[in-house]
Amino acid sequence: MPIDKIFKDDASEEKGERARMASFVGAMAISDLVKSTLGPKGMDKILQSTGRGHAVTVTNDGATILKSLHIDNPAAKVLVDISKVQDDEVGDGTTSVVVLAGELLREAEKLVASKIHPMTIIAGYRMASECARNALLKRVIDNKDNAEKFRSDLLKIAMTTLCSKILSQDKEHFAEMAVDAVFRLKGSTNLEAIQIIKKPGGSLKDSFLDEGFILDKKIGIGQPKRIENANILVANTAMDTDKVKIYGARVRVDSMTKVAEIEGAEKEKMKDKVKKIIGHGINCFVNRQLIYNFPEELFADAGILAIEHADFEGIERLGLVTGGEIASTFDNPESVKLGHCKLIEEIMIGEDKLIHFSGCEMGQACSIVLRGASHHVLDEAERSLHDALCVLSQTVNDTRVLLGGGWPEMVMAKEVDELARKTAGKKSHAIEAFSRALVAIPTTIADNAGLDSAELVAQLRAEHHTEGCNAGIDVITGAVGDMEERGIYEAFKVKQAVLLSATEASEMILRVDEIITCAPRRREDRM
């Protein structure tokens, strides 16, 4: 009985060589798509949404580009997933991981065409991956015992991460900001305490780091503009009185006096609620929902700063940094945890008024205010800065660093080549192929900078045959240079994640020998 008779209508399958080719082609297409964004001279892509408003994103972040694509090919989806995981785990290397996985599959395609079994290729790739990782471990730099040198390493890593982004022109300024912000976290990798606020206007150079928390709200009329030693109640509760109008209920009354009585009763109810809130011993009340005029007047009379309609992310972060909890009921003041800070005041950034909380309970809190020409510039600046913050927070925990500019790939390729010479059998072809795939990263960096990649990579290979060589590609001068002298550093954790994720993804795709596309379940099938 033919296999296709087992499947329902609309289901399809591809077997053997066709399935493998479909997987390879899809993965290589995704790799080629993001390849041009790699390196300091990588180009940006414009992503235009087909939805309402046709939103436009301008970016060169691999993960952002791939997340925005609607992909049909299953192997391509695997590469999109590894890029997302790389972004979540370490923040940088999202393009490198896809390019390396694509190159490994390109090499594997040639080996399969030479009648080498996929399992032999996988075994060779595993050996090569382990050898490459060990080569990096031998050459890591670790300055965790020297605070000054370690800070310098972090600055260099931040500048390397930012040099391929929109912030490259002011990378020193933003690297300083990112390192200062990460040091305030005191070893934590929770970036929630670092708030990024985007305000159009000015230039990227006008961006600054502020110690404390900034809430994008104005202080109401008649409210105190400055409060010292603040006790803050963060809440998510309805502060409106006119329930009858809101819920569309109807009340029949025989005189206007009765209407006045209903309104009076609602006002009394609101007075009681405000009294309970004031009874917590607070001088600042921040609410997720609207605060109507009447309760706002009551708070102003009591000398309490009332902030309404704070966005949910804003109040969650405010609760976190001030040490408070979000409350919804106010009958038991002793069970409500209040937030504390030394000073609340109104500040101006550009044309906008914002509320600044300084001296917060959580000392790690800080805000980065980004200025820029447009929302597109600010969105890309935020993504770039977030990548740098992720890499730095990971490096504070795993303090090992490496040189950059294609140096790690050449070190790994040299060791893997030596392993290939010592290995007998067909596996040695797979190990050699792994080495060629590694060299594709410095080749792409040089190509994207408009340099002669064949010449530069040949020069690099020759340089790396001397022991302890620090040579890499310097795209600014367009020549091979000493990466230590140029101050081009990368985090070991990023490189390790790129190597292991790309190898595992290519392994997974290599194992495929059949793709079965299932038909969607029809409505009657679900009954």
From Swiss-Prot:
**Record's GO cellular component terms:** chaperonin-containing T-complex; plant-type cell wall; plastid
What Gene Ontology terms describe what this protein does at the molecular function level? ATP binding; ATP hydrolysis activity; ATP-dependent protein folding chaperone; unfolded protein binding
Q: Which UniProt keywords apply?
A: ATP-binding, Chaperone, Cytoplasm, Nucleotide-binding
Compartmental location:
Cytoplasm
> Where does the sequence pass through the membrane?
none
Q: Which residues form a coiled coil?
A: none
Pfam families assigned: Cpn60_TCP1 (PF00118)
- Is-annotated flag, keyword ATP-binding? yes
Q: Which InterPro entries match?
A: Chap_CCT_beta, Chaperone_TCP-1, Chaperonin_TCP-1_CS, Cpn60/GroEL/TCP-1, GroEL-like_apical_dom_sf, GROEL-like_equatorial_sf, TCP-1-like_intermed_sf, TCP-1_chaperonin
Query: What family does the entry list?
Result: Belongs to the TCP-1 chaperonin family.
Role summary: Molecular chaperone; assists the folding of proteins upon ATP hydrolysis. Known to play a role, in vitro, in the folding of actin and tubulin.
**Self-association and partners:** Heterooligomeric complex of about 850 to 900 kDa that forms two stacked rings, 12 to 16 nm in diameter.
Q: What is this protein called?
A: T-complex protein 1 subunit beta
